[in-house]
UniProtKB/Swiss-Prot annotation:
Family stated for the protein in its record: Belongs to the ClpX chaperone family. HslU subfamily.
Predominant place of localization: cytoplasm
UniProt-recorded name of the protein: ATP-dependent protease ATPase subunit HslU
Entry binding sites for ATP: I18, G60, V61, G62, K63, T64, E65, D259, E325, R397
Gene Ontology terms: cellular component: HslUV protease complex
NCBIfam families: hslU, PRK05201.1
Entry's localization field: Cytoplasm
Alphabetically ordered keywords of this record: ATP-binding, Chaperone, Cytoplasm, Nucleotide-binding, Stress response
Quaternary structure (record): A double ring-shaped homohexamer of HslV is capped on each side by a ring-shaped HslU homohexamer. The assembly of the HslU/HslV complex is dependent on binding of ATP.
One of the GO BP terms on file: protein unfolding
Length: 447
């Protein structure tokens, strides 16, 4: 679980997302409150439930990116899911309980990796011993007294020399034969609606059939060391303990990001006739968000303290079009702003992995030095903003289209210009994009 303060969380988000201070603050406080709650003593701790967040804003302004970056900072089980994937119980499709099942799978994987890291050092030593046993088989005891001791000393000295060479990577390309446990063959079973639990049990039963079998393989020592380290680390783990910790982690720290929630509002489906009732999906979400118990293959999981963050563009609908009960489950509402020309300019250059840095790195692999002048950056931002205003507003995603079109010729012929420098200034931008950006009909199709 993350112990970062709200200011530190916002500072980290600022490295990747421009603007949207209100949304960043709301998310940072919600994440910090998870830690604060853990410091409160029972029974009051059980009464403190997370305050779910509804992010409202046009497409391409950073809603999904905030969630994606939050996942890395949270150090907690996190799942991002589109609300449109689900159907009302009784219809063909996924039911909302599968959100929790997917989240617990993520938590088990995360917990297993955490526990394996704790024992990795010891597992690596044991893996090295197994490889050294293959390279230097133990000599059979021959003779008595001093001779046997002398042989043992020699063997230990040789073993230490080989261990040193192994750790320095000098033996990486040498091949060895190993008996490696085969992973159990996965079996995909189509689940009828409402029978996901039975399907999981059948899948688990079949997956255990092939487990424990060993296969003899010839691999390089570098790969062998990794395989054996994973095998030894897995032996040290207690599976029941991992499952218990994973369930506890989901219940106390889990975060669910529900994207496109505006697409399941009733207004969007007025007059839709035979379409599956989206209002039914909202009603199915209610108990999950409010707090219920979901049966999974790892045991019962309570959702009372899972944090839900929902987001939507709400172009054709309003938050008030959600059913009242669901509206009440998202007490914190944050509106994200549309992007200005200055925001576009900052997105191009100010973030840690900005588009400009990405394209410079890509073309540097062909020994082409790409430079962006300040006036070139400004002109790019103005064109992206202008096209958004004239056609559909897709936010920062417009920059991908604009810069890809701008660098199309450079990218295509980069191999012929090795060692050269290409400067992108306002004139270059106008020459490449001017006609397309000014012609509204053309920009609809090209940009």
């Amino acid at each position: 679980m993350s112990t970062m303060t709200p200011a530190e969380i916002v500072s980290e988000l600022d490295k990747h997302i421009i603007g949207q201070a209100k949304a960043k603050k709301a998310v940072a406080v919600a994440l910090r409150n998870r830690w604060r709650r853990q410091q409160v003593a029972d029974p009051l701790r059980q009464e403190i439930t997370p305050k779910n967040i509804l992010m409202i804003g046009p497409t391409g302004v950073g809603k999904t990116e905030i969630a994606r970056r939050l996942a890395k900072l949270a150090d907690a089980p996190f799942i991002k899911i589109e609300a449109t994937k689900f159907t009302e119980v009784g219809y063909v499709g996924r039911d909302v309980d599968s959100i929790v099942r997917d989240l617990i799978e993520i938590s088990v994987k995360q917990t297993r990796e955490t526990e394996m890291r704790k024992v990795r050092s010891k597992a690596t030593d044991q893996a090295e011993d197994r490889i050294l046993d293959i390279l230097l088989p133990q000599p059979r005891a021959v003779g008595f007294g001093g001779n046997a001791e002398h042989a043992n000393d020699d063997n230990n000295a040789t073993r230490q020399t080989f261990r040193k060479r192994l750790r320095e990577g000098q033996l990486d390309d040498k091949e060895v034969e190993l008996d490696i446990e085969q992973p159990s063959a996965g079996m995909d079973i189509m689940a009828p609606p409402g029978m996901e639990e039975m399907t999981e049990q059948i899948r688990s039963m079949f997956s255990n059939l092939g487990s424990g079998k060993k296969q003899r393989r010839k691999v390089k020592i570098k790969e062998a060391l990794k395989l054996l380290t994973d095998e030894e680390a897995a032996k040290m783990l207690n599976d029941e303990e991992v499952k218990t910790k994973a369930v506890q982690n989901v219940e106390q720290n889990g975060i669910v990001f529900l994207d496109e929630i505006d697409k399941i509002t009733s207004r969007n489906n007025e007059g839709s006739g035979g379409e599956v009732s989206r209002q039914g999906v909202q009603r199915d979400l209610l108990p999950l968000v409010e707090g219920t118990t979901v049966n999974t293959k790892y045991g019962m999981v309570k959702t009372d303290h899972i944090l839900f963050i929902a987001s939507g563009a709400f172009h054709l609908a309003k938050p008030s079009d959600l059913i009242p009960e669901l509206q009440g489950r998202f007490p914190i509402r944050v509106e994200l702003d549309s992007l200005s020309v200055n925001d576009f300019e900052a997105i191009l250059v100010a973030t840690d992995a900005s588009l400009v840095k990405q394209y410079q790195a890509l073309l540097a692999t062909e020994d082409v030095q790409l430079e962006f002048a300040d006036d070139g950056i400004r002109r790019l931002a103005e064109i992206a903003y202008s096209v958004n205003e004239k056609t559909e507003n897709i936010g920062a995603r417009r920059l991908y289209t604009v810069i890809e079109k701008l660098l199309e010729e450079v990218s295509f012929s980069a191999g012929n210009h090795a060692g050269e420098r290409v400067t992108i200034d306002a004139k270059y931008v106008d020459r490449a994009l001017g006609e397309v950006s000014q012609d509204e009909d053309l920009s609809r199709y090209v940009l």
